[in-house]
Amino acid sequence: PYFGGYSSMNALTYFISTHKDWQELLARPPYNLQIKCDGNYALLKYNMIESNFDLPEVCEARGCIYKRDGDDWFLINYPFSKFWNYGESRAANIKWENAVVTEKIDGSMVTLWWDEGWHWSTSGTIDAFAAPVNGTDKTFGNLIDEAINYRYGSVENFLKIADADGSKGKSTHIFE
């Protein structure tokens, strides 16, 4: 089956495809997902306190976005699943003899994805230009534009690079 730009079905997509009342079910315990809708899009994000991270559907809900087409929903933006930091009980078992550690800096995750045009999202908002930055009059979309203009000269120059890799509609670009 084809699920947006992804060739296999994850647990969350399977749940959505097999439950017509998925929004109501996933918003309640044990999932407690935050579901934000904007037009034909729905963004799903776990709740750090109330969601049950033993469930794969919860771990996959890290700002993924689905698009409605009639009665069906297709995954079109999948940043990556929940992961845990070193020392946390659910952290991956790392083979340190083969690992290379550089640096991990926490930030705000934003994604660039294609659906009849390029879209910027945060992990909690479908449209980054509707996501306010605390303490400022700017949005995350404004900050993205400023950073791109500084580094690439213009958003158009940056999008030429994003278009050149052939990923349009097939992958999610992630920035933090």
Predicted regions and their residues:
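Core nucleotide-handling region used for phosphoryl-transfer chemistry
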Residues: 3-176
